[in-house]
C-alpha cells in the first residue's frame, strides 16, 4: 500500500557564527513510501558538525500531522526514549542519513535534521 503523503521536509538553517553560516539541506523534498518497505532521508551540512569535544551534534525530528515536532535521534545515531528501533541514524562530518527499516502508517509526517554544533 502506497502512502501518498509527504514523509519529509526541507530544512535550511542559517546560523551566524565566527566561521560563517551553516546551511542544512535535506533530500528528497518528498518521498512516496510503501508500508513495510524501507525509506531513507539524507541531510547535508555546509560545514563539519564535529564539535571540539569530539561529538557530532546532529538531531532528527519527526512532526506528525497536527502534532508538535519530537526528537527521534540525537548525536547522529542515538535513539530518544520511546523511539522504535526501525528508525536509525548514521553519518559523519557533513553527511547524515535517517533510515526507516519498515515504514508504518504512523510514520507519515515531516522529518527535519537539525545541527547543534555551531551557534552564534
Swiss-Prot record:
SMART domains: IGv. Residues 60-74 are annotated as: Framework-2. Residues 21-43 are annotated as: Framework-1. One of its GO terms (biological process) is immune response. Residues 44-59 are annotated as: Complementarity-determining-1. Residues 114-120 are annotated as: Complementarity-determining-3. The keyword Signal applies. Disulfide bonds join 43-113. Residues 75-81 are annotated as: Complementarity-determining-2. Residues 1-20 form the signal peptide. InterPro entries: Ig-like_dom, Ig-like_dom_sf, Ig-like_fold, Ig_V-set, IgV_Light_Chain. PANTHER family: IMMUNOGLOBULIN LIGHT CHAIN. V region of the variable domain of immunoglobulin light chains that participates in the antigen recognition. Immunoglobulins, also known as antibodies, are membrane-bound or secreted glycoproteins produced by B lymphocytes. In the recognition phase of humoral immunity, the membrane-bound immunoglobulins serve as receptors which, upon binding of a specific antigen, trigger the clonal expansion and differentiation of B lymphocytes into immunoglobulins-secreting plasma cells. This is Immunoglobulin kappa variable 2D-30. It comes from Homo sapiens (Human). The gene is IGKV2D-30.
